Amino acid sequence: MTLKPLILIPARMGSTRLPEKVLAEISGKPMIVHVAERAKEAALGPTIIATDHDAIAQAVTAYGHEYVMTHTHHQSGSDRIYEALTRIDPEQRYNAILNVQGDLPTVTPNALISVLQLLKNNLTDIATLGAEIIEDNEKNNPNIVKIIGTPIAQNRLRALYFTRATAPYGNGPLYHHIGLYAYRRKALEKFVSLKPSTLEQREKLEQLRALENNMRIDVEIVDTALLGVDTHHDLEKVRKILA
């Protein structure tokens, strides 16, 4: 099946730890604009911001990007992009949906290309990225989500679990999950129809809902983890990177 991608960027105002972070200024532009620009550079398909707030819509429009308004109350970014998808594409022209977090301004075009490539395997429902953890302090940090997976090819895993704990035990690399996803459209439809699962709620990781319902997630291991913004400290680090 030929992949016809659509890139959706969920962006909301109601962040708990860093309010209005997607509008934070980085090198003269709002964070969300940096994300949209990198996504467009990948040239994979249309790039549209899914938002719940007029201020975000105005910010992205000022830089020539498209947006769609969604409801404020969604349990996850996946629910928001599914609502956006049904509004944008009721004709079902697009069969591969990339979910690029609005707080991931360090995303690269190559990262988007890499995650989409995983869907060329017809057995893969959802694709995502990971990177080896190098810093010791990150191995025990619950904010760094770890991937437990079985190797299926060079630099490629089939995910068995995601956790905030330090795992797996023993010698060998630990992998940091990068929150960038590519879904088959049918997989996204199935995912949002499922109730939040037991382990998802315990770990506070929505991707576990897919694994607990026998959906397959494949992971491409890339050289460098992409830095997302959850705190003021993260924001200052990103400002230095993108200066």
Curated annotation (Swiss-Prot):
Pfam families cross-referenced by the UniProt entry: CTP_transf_3
Major subcellular site: cytoplasm
Cellular localisation: Cytoplasm
EC number of the protein: 2.7.7.38
One cellular component (GO) term of this entry: cytosol
Keywords, comma-separated and alphabetical: Cytoplasm, Lipopolysaccharide biosynthesis, Nucleotidyltransferase, Transferase
Pathways per UniProt: Nucleotide-sugar biosynthesis; CMP-3-deoxy-D-manno-octulosonate biosynthesis; CMP-3-deoxy-D-manno-octulosonate from 3-deoxy-D-manno-octulosonate and CTP: step 1/1; Bacterial outer membrane biogenesis; lipopolysaccharide biosynthesis
Gene3D superfamilies: Spore Coat Polysaccharide Biosynthesis Protein SpsA, Chain A (3.90.550.10)
SUPFAM superfamilies per UniProt: Nucleotide-diphospho-sugar transferases
MF (Gene Ontology): 3-deoxy-manno-octulosonate cytidylyltransferase activity
Family annotation (InterPro entries): Cytidylyl_trans, KdsB, Nucleotide-diphossugar_trans
Reaction(s) catalysed (UniProt annotation): 3-deoxy-alpha-D-manno-oct-2-ulosonate + CTP = CMP-3-deoxy-beta-D-manno-octulosonate + diphosphate
One BP term from GO: CMP-keto-3-deoxy-D-manno-octulosonic acid biosynthetic process
Assigned protein family: Belongs to the KdsB family.
Function: Activates KDO (a required 8-carbon sugar) for incorporation into bacterial lipopolysaccharide in Gram-negative bacteria.
Name of the featured protein: 3-deoxy-manno-octulosonate cytidylyltransferase
Gene this protein is translated from: kdsB
